[in-house]
């Protein structure tokens, strides 16, 4: 282990030497740039663009370009990047993670690689964790970029598509990670290229990169629409059931936070819902509601995982920032289960129209880089998932902060009393204190204790984040006491007030260790910025969640031996700190494995998503007649259906083909059973199914030609073809996403049967994808053949399709005339009326049976 650490340190030192060499080359241009007039310095941008067009690479332009930005920053912003900031900029340009401590000027560092990469004209995205920081940084740094002749755009969620398009067309675009992801998904739901807002993804520089690419990695971005509200009753019934259970009826796995029914719980469920077998295939949907109700009632904790707003809404609490996540909902029905648990109105369940994880979103950029104060602990993940190295950048001044060893108490009460005593001592002498908590309820408890102790303070948590930047900025003033949930206010520096340096600087007190060392380091990093003095101290108890989940029995035994009766006894030792870090490493390993598994599942969907999106883009951008594509779909549908029926008894097969032809290809009186028998040269022993395929294809071609003649112009024909294909593809893709979600839940259970869930998911999802392609082609065929075609205004078609594209649809199976097919009288072994050639129980009756 020591050898590995030594090798890592040596590699970092070697990298730093290379960076210093390039940085010195940048610095060598300083005098030459300073001698230029404003106009001459500004003209450098156009010169660089021309040199790039003539074949010079960005790497070759780097020293001069960085020097131009340094001189421009001095003239426009009054700031001149240090050598360590130049080094950080080089790391970012190379597509790696620059680990720079708090207060080292990451925002200014970013200007150099952003400017250089904007020279290509392909666009640069600067990604921030919230819109406040996007607007702040775009305004402050935008002055410099504009002065140098580059355009700057801000992409906000409130902007119209036209405004977003304008922002993305700028040389440099500031945006949040979620908005870039949602825009990508929405771009792949439009029906015309001119409605897309993004350009091809070129270079992204992500601020607080660990927050976006690590903490948010398991969070999918989802565009969805409502489904029937009748299912809401099932949420209430499932909630009522799980509230009747005792602790013996279910099992919770604390490390993984999973829950499931025991045998007694299963028996109670079967009795409650009047079932013979809870896990029969017919009850898959019900078990999903029960699982969510179990999680909502026994895993998800109020004021930790979510809060109930005064407006009776469930608001998610971000576990890494402590902020409420406005507009975000737990997916897959969990949010509705929590609403049922808390007795607030259950909102309509939604159906996913498009989704993508942050991991696959950002891996689509040609080049990706990021900045953070704490990335080294996650270096393996950055390298393996994103192919990014983490390079620690030296501080401009030596760090003076004193990090004290952890203090461990036996109970929460003893720990919190000690925290208040420490705060009181520091407050009395005027030293500012920042108290970090991991949960809203802890913030509220400490706040109450400080009030009782007569200590004035500010509270910054998920219930009060509007003023967070202002509160954090003042947290370094003399006598200031601030309670902050986790890393609320991240991105805003804490500057020390007058006389605070002499008092020892800002003291950061952690009331609990987070499961990630990185989050603890972020809290510590709020103190001691730019070489200022400071302190950090963590208070722990054996009742903390991390200690309960992974705490060493050795620590518990030491406490018991010291004094079993005195809960105020405290342990302070390096051994304790090492034990805690060992526990954190285990949790980090579990979390990494989970994120890696999420990526493995999403990679399957990514491949399918890219195929569908590429096909959509081809249709959207097509200036040609799409007749060859549609006729090919019709032919494949005919061949697939005839082949499917040909495996049945001869009489049944011919009747099935006849039903298909009448329902999907031609008017009912245009074909008979006798026609098929004649064409198929039917004898008692054989049928020429190939001849039937040719016959049906000829009939379909004739119908297609008649349908198209109803449209009077080439433009109208292309418009109809595009609308037809896109509406069907979008509907089927939405259903497919939902089916993949259900499949993922189902295969997860197969791990218990010694099957590899990922392999099962890959295999079955591929088959489902093939089935979806077949369903798309069938629906295009049927709609093309059976639709009542007439000229519509372009605006009407736009309105109709845009409604579908946003997922705001009610899905149902309808015949070509828009009438719903009546499935109520179809037997389970009858052929499905949709004409697929499958038996009803294996087709549209699958959910019913």
Curated annotation (Swiss-Prot):
Residue numbers binding ATP: 85, 103-107, 493
Free-text comment on the cofactor: May bind 1 zinc ion per subunit.
Reactions catalysed according to its record: ATP + H2O + cellular proteinSide 1 = ADP + phosphate + cellular proteinSide 2
The UniProt record lists the keyword Cell membrane: yes
SUPFAM superfamilies documented for this protein: Helical scaffold and wing domains of SecA, P-loop containing nucleoside triphosphate hydrolases, Pre-protein crosslinking domain of SecA
Subcellular location as annotated: Cell membrane; Cytoplasm
Bilayer topology: Peripheral membrane protein
EC number, UniProt record: 7.4.2.8
Function text: Part of the Sec protein translocase complex. Interacts with the SecYEG preprotein conducting channel. Has a central role in coupling the hydrolysis of ATP to the transfer of proteins into and across the cell membrane, serving as an ATP-driven molecular motor driving the stepwise translocation of polypeptide chains across the membrane.
Entry's family note: Belongs to the SecA family.
Protein name per UniProt: Protein translocase subunit SecA
Protein source organism: Streptococcus thermophilus (strain CNRZ 1066)
Gene: secA
């Amino acid at each position: 282990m020591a050898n590995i650490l030594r090798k890592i340190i040596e590699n970092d030192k070697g990298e730093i030497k290379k960076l210093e060499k390039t940085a010195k080359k940048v610095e060598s241009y300083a005098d030459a740039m300073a001698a230029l007039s404003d106009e001459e310095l500004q003209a450098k941008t156009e010169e660089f663009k021309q040199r790039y067009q003539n074949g010079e690479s960005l790497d070759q332009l780097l020293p001069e370009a960085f020097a131009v930005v340094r001189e421009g920053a001095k003239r426009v912003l009054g700031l001149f990047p240090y050598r360590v900031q130049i080094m950080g900029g080089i790391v970012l340009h190379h597509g790696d993670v620059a680990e720079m401590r708090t207060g080292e000027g990451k925002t200014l560092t970013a200007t150099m690689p952003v400017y250089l990469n904007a020279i290509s004209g392909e666009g640069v995205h600067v990604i921030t964790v919230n819109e406040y920081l996007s607007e702040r940084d775009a305004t402050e740094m935008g002055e410099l970029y504009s002065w140098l002749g580059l355009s700057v755009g801000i992409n906000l969620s409130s902007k119209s598509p036209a405004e977003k398009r304008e922002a993305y067309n700028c040389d440099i675009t500031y945006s949040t990670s979620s908005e870039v992801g949602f825009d990508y998904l929405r771009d792949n739901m439009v029906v015309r290229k001119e409605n897309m807002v993004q350009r091809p993804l070129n270079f992204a520089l992500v601020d607080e990169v660990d927050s976006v690419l690590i903490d948010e990695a398991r969070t999918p971005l989802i565009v969805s629409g409502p489904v029937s509200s009748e299912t809401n009753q099932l949420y209430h019934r499932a909630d009522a059931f799980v509230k009747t259970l005792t602790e013996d009826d279910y099992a919770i796995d604390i490390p993984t936070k999973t829950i499931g029914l025991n045998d007694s719980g299963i028996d109670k469920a079967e009795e409650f819902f009047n079932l013979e077998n809870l896990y029969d295939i017919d009850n898959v949907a019900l078990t999903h509601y029960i699982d969510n109700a179990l999680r909502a009632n026994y895993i998800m904790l109020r004021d930790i995982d979510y809060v109930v707003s005064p407006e009776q809404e469930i608001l998610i609490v971000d576990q890494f920032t402590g902020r409420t996540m406005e507009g975000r909902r737990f997916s897959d029905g969990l949010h509705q289960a929590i609403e049922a648990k808390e007795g607030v109105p259950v909102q309509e369940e939604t159906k996913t129209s498009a989704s993508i994880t942050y991991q696959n979103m950002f891996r689509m950029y040609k080049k990706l880089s990021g900045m953070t104060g704490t990335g080294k602990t996650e270096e393996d993940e950055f390298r393996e998932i994103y192919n990014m190295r983490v390079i620690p950048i030296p501080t401009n001044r030596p760090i003076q902060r004193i990090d004290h060893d952890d203090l461990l108490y036996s109970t929460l009460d003893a720990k919190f009393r000690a925290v208040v005593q420490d705060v009181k001592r520091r407050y009395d002498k005027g030293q500012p204190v920042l108290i970090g908590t991991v949960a809203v309820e802890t913030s509220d408890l400490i706040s109450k204790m400080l009030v009782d102790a007569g200590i004035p303070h500010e509270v910054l948590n998920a219930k009060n984040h509007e003023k967070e930047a202002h509160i954090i900025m003042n947290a370094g003033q003399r006598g200031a006491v601030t309670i902050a949930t986790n890393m609320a206010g991240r991105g805003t520096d804490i500057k020390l007030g007058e006389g605070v340096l002499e008092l020892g600087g800002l003291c950061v007190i952690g009331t609990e260790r987070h499961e990630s060392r990185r989050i603890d380091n972020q809290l510590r990093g709020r103190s001691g910025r730019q070489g200022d003095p400071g302190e950090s101290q963590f208070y722990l108890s054996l009742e903390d969640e991390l200690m309960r989940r992974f705490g060493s029995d050795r620590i518990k035994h030491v406490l018991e031996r010291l004094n079993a009766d005195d809960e105020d006894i405290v342990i302070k030792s390096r051994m304790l700190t090492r034990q805690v870090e060992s526990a954190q490493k285990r949790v980090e390993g579990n979390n990494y494995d989970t994120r890696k598994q999420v990526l493995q599942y999403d990679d399957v969907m990514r491949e399918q998503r890219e195929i569908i999106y590429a096909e959509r883009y081809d249709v959207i951008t097509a200036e040609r007649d799409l007749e060859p594509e549609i006729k090919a779909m019709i032919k494949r549908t005919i061949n697939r259906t005839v082949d499917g029926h040909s495996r049945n008894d001869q009489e049944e097969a011919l009747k099935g083909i006849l039903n298909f032809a009448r329902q999907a290809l031609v008017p009912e009186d245009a074909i008979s059973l006798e026609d098929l028998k004649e064409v198929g040269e039917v004898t008692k022993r054989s049928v020429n199914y190939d001849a039937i395929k040719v016959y049906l294809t000829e009939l379909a071609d004739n119908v297609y030609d008649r349908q198209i003649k109803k449209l009077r112009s080439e433009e109208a024909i292309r418009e109809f073809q595009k609308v037809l294909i896109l509406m069907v593809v979008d509907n089927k893709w939405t259903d497919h996403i939902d089916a993949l979600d259900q499949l993922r839940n189902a295969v997860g259970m197969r791990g218990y049967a010694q099957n590899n869930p990922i392999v099962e998911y890959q295999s079955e999802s591929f088959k489902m994808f093939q089935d979806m392609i077949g369903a798309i082609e069938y629906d295009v065929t049927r709609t093309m053949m059976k639709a009542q075609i007439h000229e519509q205004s372009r605006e009407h078609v736009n309105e109709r399709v845009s409604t579908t594209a946003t997922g705001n649809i009610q899905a149902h199976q309808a015949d070509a005339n828009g009438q719903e097919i009546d499935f109520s009288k179809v037997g389970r072994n009858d052929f499905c009326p949709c004409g697929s050639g499958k038996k009803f129980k294996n087709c549209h009756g699958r959910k019913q049976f």
